[in-house]
């Protein structure tokens, strides 16, 4: 396989460097707001309750309806990011993440591995097609726009990043694996045979994350399923950040999603200026 990569390398690097003339339409948009950590200071359940109340108020003011989840559909996962010592992935706008479900207080032996090409500018159609063709047959693919609100603490200010990603479930711990091992799963990554032995290790301490669905906002033509992510250090002692988000497919309900997003940004008592989780 590495011999084939060596022959194709110049074309591959050129393909990832140059953007296509036409931009690809995103499969989905994810709206994100960073929640003030003090909202979850007493407990996550109390934080969920406070956010539900805020969502109900915002929905009511916009002529929408909020339906809170009956139970907190909460899942605990260990999150880990990888790169080489010289940040070979980050230099080419890639990130590699693995999530391990927590069972009986311990991370599973295998987790979901996600490779992501992420930029502040839109990706071209040809670039997206190459990304899709270079993924493993069983991987789950998506092209998404991430919209972060309250940039610099100002309501209405937002930052958008575009990402093409593919994930594979039930993968063994990737710590100590190499770029060559990664290329076995994702063959069209833009690395040469000489890079194959570069070792992948965690880029930061692991994170213990609690992910929950807390309800949904409904309006004519669509709905927004509200999700939270609360991140702690690996021991679960220090709260690092919290986030409220929802995803939707671009279409007729775009204006409703934007109106809800703008309304929530007025709650500076609940939401804070911050950064995307992956940039921690």
Can you describe what each PLM-predicted range is?
Residues 10-19:
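Bacterial N-terminal signal peptides
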Residues 23-280:
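Phosphate-end processing signature that detects enzymes handling 5′-triphosphorylated RNA
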Residues 1-11:
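Bacterial N-terminal signal peptides that target proteins for export
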Residues 1-2, 20-24:
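Basic/polar N-terminal segments that are highly enriched at the extreme N-terminus
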